[in-house]
């Protein structure tokens, strides 16, 4: 719009765009070769994906120790109504060993919030039945009811400033705060003892330099350099863009595309990358996203469980009697 306004008013103004969004929604749809049109991925996404993956690894260690009282941990993440950020949780556990549910805005109904809550509860209880604990990563744009969302001057939802949050609404439902007994005690919907608790990383997702992806940092610099070269050449009305080589090993090139093309492009998380059970993503997403987070993730020690013969009488905690 600025570029067109400058032209109409005969202003000597060069307008060049540079992609930048952790949501990864600037660009076109998935192509047949496995890359995205317009701009394969946006600077910022690789780092927020790495941040979330490390958070999941750490949360899993804590959940393994606390599940007897807090069997369910719900982590709400940014991304508005686009699912690329919550999908990155799978990068922490590509072998699917963690009792992890990934809930994307594109996975569930846009209108039936009650059905969404019931569906998530069913999937949580399936995990609890098998593994006695569960970690849920949910995008802030998933419909779980009225959150009292504020909107900016353009009408865009400001999820971080809403009266309620998606993760809080979900744990309220799981814990049964909407159906208290005559003594004021919530009637949990979980099939095990304990509660669901929530966590919202907030702006740490996009600001923590200690979790930055070196690949992301390098590409952010280079796409900025390319934009500068476009401007210095005298060209106008373009955005610098990242073009991914569909072949291995991972490699990108930098190019330009008309701002009008970018403005008319739209990207959502591909339906073909959502698992059949709607609570996970496919290996195709993992293969696409893994190079973006850079160096290998931290590894946690796994102790071998060696049991000795039982000698003491069985002890049952007071709460379980």
Regions found by a protein language model. Give the residues of each.
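Generic secondary-structure boundary signal with a strong preference for alpha-helix termini
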Residues: 31, 91, 95, 236-239, ...
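Residue-level preference for alpha-helix termini and adjacent loops
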Residues: 21, 25, 77, 101-102, ...
